[in-house]
Amino acid sequence: MAGGVDGPIGIPFPDHSSDILSGLNEQRTQGLLCDVVILVEGREFPTHRSVLAACSQYFKKLFTSGAVVDQQNVYEIDFVSAEALTALMDFAYTATLTVSTANVGDILSAARLLEIPAVSHVCADLLDRQILAADAGADAGQLDLVDQIDQRNLLRAKEYLEFFQSNPMNSLPPAAAAAAASFPWSAFGASDDDLDATKEAVAAAVAAVAAGDCNGLDFYGPGPPAERPPTGDGDEGDSNPGLWPERDEDAPTGGLFPPPVAPPAATQNGHYGRGGEEEAASLSEAAPEPGDSPGFLSGAAEGEDGDGPDVDGLAASTLLQQMMSSVGRAGAAAGDSDEESRADDKGVMDYYLKYFSGAHDGDVYPAWSQKVEKKIRAKAFQKCPICEKVIQGAGKLPRHIRTHTGEKPYECNICKVRFTRQDKLKVHMRKHTGEKPYLCQQCGAAFAHNYDLKNHMRVHTGLRPYQCDSCCKTFVRSDHLHRHLKKDGCNGVPSRRGRKPRVRGGAPDPSPGATATPGAPAQPSSPDARRNGQEKHFKDEDEDEDVASPDGLGRLNVAGAGGGGDSGGGPGAATDGNFTAGLA
């Protein structure tokens, strides 16, 4: 081959994924680079968030919920057993599930609670088929107790997840935070009275937030000024100007968490992106315009013009806090007839929706959420601006437009023939390289195109899928049927005897209707019969057959040899030409 094909080449490594998983499992067993600890029944399970989130939908929602999910490093759960969690951890890191009759029930329950469908389906199948049978001696009372435990564990799992999804303690005033802190979720297995007290504390915290007692800036503790993230004015050390709000010295203090040290690539929602000045510039451009922002709480900072607050520099947690306050005011004033106030609240909600669904998507949402968007894009419909034809599939519209413009961007390096599609060029290159990748498994014949192999296989199978609706004649290939209908013409009379092999160099077989007189010259054929015979002479062997005359008393036989003139009569004079059998 004279030259290589332009463009990137994808080289797969089949063992890469298993090697990566093996390396992660080695890190887990040695306690290296683990960023979260799961505490169950007093046992600690150091692990990686990303691995658990990739296997379990429950852990994915747990690790991505709340404003400070990155600061939560220990999760204590009591709705699964330590033995079941050990088996699920091994499955996540080794792609192998180890079950026994003793623990298959616990593993099934844990897999359902943690939303691991692959494991739950396998365990359920093992129990249904009695491959791993449960305890057959269990009575009805024990089964009811197991069901009650499962229902209780399901309720606890939901409440545990809802707590971190709402995460009210992260934005409480100091008094409410102190009250709620006395009921940590680390004591999740406490009595029902403790759980009720925790719910009351959470409800009081939400009520305080809705009443506007929290301005959203208490999320960060006071801390020394040196520990605060720089709010710089464009200095070199300020890698993210405008991302952190300037703290008012008179603002309330005593937040739950110490002020985080600003990372080089911290984004407005607390996650980490590319970092640097380019990231800050992109975030500043993507944020909504200050003029579009509505009025906020009295605790918000005023803008430069004094007409409205400047919220573009606030963190996402602060904006979310203010949105919750606006929702609380909207609920309190539901019976108010002042349309102007309701319009202001609607403007607040519109602004927040615009902010959180803005151009931050590429940095906020992880790759797993973009897969769904990619699938939707692949099924999208696009209309051609030239012929208005609807094209299904993303990326196919430019290829269709080339049929209008005549553009052929793909050129053969050898013969300089150009093509509109790259796959057509790839097939064309087989003419130069002699490559025939399609091999017949029965006779070993090789072909350059898959459709040639498909047609060849019908020689072995005897399949003739294309049939004429008028004469019921069948064909191996569709182009043969089209030629039969267009070029040859179909008389609509079905054949009585079916197919007949081509006669090569000999006299045609005598038919019952033939009345040629021995020794007499053959009657010259009519022009129509001569033309029909010449066309049939060049037809493929599998397409030749006798065509009955309309009255069924005579037949037209076509002999081989290429002569076009008439020959002498007699029994042995049928070596050249076309002969017409006489009609009785």
UniProtKB/Swiss-Prot annotation:
Subcellular location: Nucleus
Biased composition (Low complexity): 281-290, 505-527
Effect in UniProt of substituting K539R: No effect on sumoylation with SUMO1. Decreased transcription repression activity. No effect on promoter binding
Domain of life per record: Eukaryota
Effect of P14S: No effect on transcription repressor activity. No effect on nuclear localization
Subunit relationships: Homodimer. Interacts with BCL6. Interacts with RELA; involved in the control by RELA of the accessibility of target gene promoters. Interacts with AR (via NR LBD domain); the interaction is direct and androgen-dependent. Interacts with NCOR1. Interacts with NCOR2. Interacts with SMAD4; the interaction is direct and stimulated by TGFB1. Interacts with HDAC1. Interacts with SP1; ZBTB7A prevents the binding to GC-rich motifs in promoters and represses the transcriptional activity of SP1. Interacts with the DNA-dependent protein kinase complex/DNA-PKc.
The protein, known as: Zinc finger and BTB domain-containing protein 7A
Source organism of this protein record: Homo sapiens (Human)
Origin organism lineage: Eukaryota, Metazoa, Chordata, Craniata, Vertebrata
